[in-house]
Amino acid sequence: AIAAAGFDGIEIFEQDFIAHDGDPREVGEMIRAMGLEITLFQPFRDFEGLPGPLRNKAFDRAERKFDLMQELGTDLVLICSSCHPEALGGIDRAADDFRELGDRAAKRGLCIGYEALAWGRHVNDHRDAWEVVRRADHPNVGLILDSFHTLSRKIDPETIRRIPGDKIFFVQLADAPAFEMDLLYWSRHFRNMPGEGDLEVTAFMQAVMATGYAGPISLEIFNDQFRGGSPATIARDGHRSLVALMDDVAHSEPELPAVAPAVPARAEATGIAFLEFATKGAEADALETLLGTLGFTHSANHKSKALSLWTQGDIRLVVNRETKGYSSSAYTMHGTSVCDIGIAVDSAVDTVTRAQALGSASFAQPIDPGQLKIPAIRGQSGSVLHFIDDKSGLSEVWGIEFTPVATADRGTGLTRVDHIAQTMSYDEMLSWSLFYTTLFDMKKSIVVDVIDPDGLVRSQAIESPDGALRVTLNGAETHRTMAGTFLAESFHASVQHIALATDDIFATAEALAERGFSALPISLNYYGDLAARFDLDHAVLARLRAANILYDEDAKGAFFQLYSQPFAGGMFFEIVQRTDGYGGYGGPNAPFRIAAQKRLIRQKGIPKK
């Protein structure tokens, strides 16, 4: 998996080797046959500072590991700072131990790398580890740096710049969410790829590169979500994270030596250009009826395909009834679902170029004469994203490929796509987050818990700086939740709900009611609680209750939410209004919305048809 993802080498973790039943020479040959090298053997623990017989035993253990390294075919071992209860402190004592071990390693053509564990007994800071290496003054003894061990202890990474690059033998990288907990537990369970957490990994790597370091850049990740994950996905995410990280380093400090080919900058997304539904037959008819009820106009048909365009404000929804090609396959797999997301960007070509550099596969289908070739990639879970820009004429696709059939009226006051909500297994959330934040200029919010009557759903918002593109990721941990049921029944379709913006929620609610829109009925108890939580005028509260509108506030403004009833296996529409810069997504209302939806959907065990 890692060879296919584009990596050059692999570390051998001792526990993995011990669990393997193969000969070390066989392991080495297998790795090299895949075009990889063994860059490091690790970890060798509790070496330095031991007294008397314990010291002799430590050297004996080291010699045995040297034997193993030579059979594997690697020349560098990581020795982490000692946690042994009988280890003695002292920089000079440790330096003497490493100088002697360096002599032994040199006789075999091997090298020693010393790493400061964040929880080491006497050495837990890379500055102290460097001082040990400096005083050992041996060509076969160098420093190993690990971003987690430095950043978790809030050590300034700028101190790395004072270390000679040729004395740094190896660099390991890991990010992590900003938790306050025991360092060892944090490290063993919550490390993740650079960019997936909250540590200043870019600043760390800038400091490393400023030393002149030219050695391997590795990932050392311990994470409960990864342990049972797909090796191919994890490897691709790891490579993606390193490409994005080194690109960030290059842009942050251009004078540093380049370590990777230049790629276009993160794409500036200006919004959702279109959403395309794969559907057929009676399900397509029902979807189009719902769109009409929402105030959309069937404004155009594709000139050569079974595609209809539905518009309102700046919103474009495409209903695809094709019986062959990607959309037909998507329908067969997922049922009625969003099969394609069109994103408006500053440069479609540059966006795809960056996506490919990050490991995404391009996507293309045969096109008819007169059609535009719109750049596209495969996203997460096999989804497709097309990119549209103004400068290349791609935004003219609606006039070029579609024939008008009606003129859109005002509809119900919907103006644009506020956000889309994508659902995935919780174990896949980090991968989805990394996909968006490395490809687009987007920032992620903290992960929050959404209470479902049947379990927890983890939710994270990812936004462009101006809010033009907003995506919420919802990670389901059990199939019993609303999100989990959607995943199970749609075979992992991604878009579960589409939030559409209005400038006047009450006028929109009235217009929807006139068209026969069936709003999600909200419990009257909700509005009693709302009156207690917020200082709302009685008349406003009555209008909210009458229209089944939910309400929230933050420090800046207010948020109004109106939901459709679920359709097509658990998808739904949301109509929202933001006032005065409200920046959230109505999170406090989610449990009440989910409970209302669950009262309407069919019970588990009852077949669809």
Describe each PLM feature range.
Residues 2-4, 19-42, 61-73, 96-107, ...:
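Acidic (Asp/Glu)-rich catalytic clusters
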Residues 2-16, 65, 72-73, 288-297, ...:
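Catalytic domains of carbohydrate-active enzymes, especially glycoside hydrolases
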Residues 9-10, 41, 100-198:
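Acidic/histidine-rich catalytic cores of soluble enzymes
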Residues 11, 40-42, 78, 113, ...:
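Conserved beta-strand positions in the central sheet of alpha/beta enzyme cores
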Residues 12-24, 46-56, 84-89, 119-124, ...:
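Acidic-and-aromatic substrate-binding clefts and catalytic sites of carbohydrate-active enzymes
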Residues 29, 60-62, 86-87, 96, ...:
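Extended, hydrophobic interaction surfaces within ordered domains
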Residues 37, 48-143, 152, 233, ...:
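Active-site acidic/histidine proton-transfer and metal-coordination neighborhood
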Residues 251, 256-300, 311-364, 376-444, ...:
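Glyoxalase I/VOC metalloenzyme domain signal
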